[in-house]
């Protein structure tokens, strides 16, 4: 073979190799597909944090409303790229409602995005549009007292655990619950003709946990639950009674396999 022919063949092999490498890289490194509404990766199950606000018979002060805003922003800031944040409220009908359908994965800030595959400015604008405006709407009306005949806290938490995007297949499930923790349904109620002997009136936590598991299964097992225990001076509950309510809940959560932590949420 003449040297010129050899060089030509060698160049063809090199070019073919380069083109093959480029094609392979384009195939392997193509951007993952994102859901346009949630910004979550398609066909992946991300870790999920839910902030649930109790709107039943809870009158939040202006200071508490501002702190709720901060709590949600802190939850947002704690997300790793790809993790999900949702807002829920327990409304006047005793129903859990996905507040303004807000449920968004963190795609990363614009400066964290690879500009070869996605437009950083569009990602940033999309994320801000899906977070800031719905958040502002979600906080509207928090200062209004909503008259509610029931407060199904236990049932609502268990129901969250049965959602497809928050069931036991979801890694690192976390709920931040903002509530006075005053359960009031047929399952059980903290209310009575008088508030004396509260500890004696509350049902056995093991029985409550068993009733929930009979209805919802082990939906809450493994969930990390952070409770912001709302204090309201106008509601007449003494610190001693609030301590009894907290201890009762802690036993229920222990039986359900929930890892709970508590913080006071003063007026």
Model regions and ranges:
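Von Willebrand factor
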Residues: 44-170, 174-176
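N-terminal post-signal-peptidase region of extra-cytosolic proteins
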Residues: 67-74, 157-161, 205-214
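Acidic/histidine-rich, surface-exposed loop or edge segments in extracytoplasmic proteins
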Residues: 45-59, 136-143, 228-233
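Acidic, polar low-complexity linker/tail segments
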Residues: 2-50, 56-63, 77
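DG-centered beta-turn motif at the end of beta-strands
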Residues: 53-55, 160, 172-184
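Von Willebrand factor type A / integrin I
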Residues: 199-267
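Short, surface-exposed, charged loop/turn segments at secondary-structure junctions
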Residues: 187-202
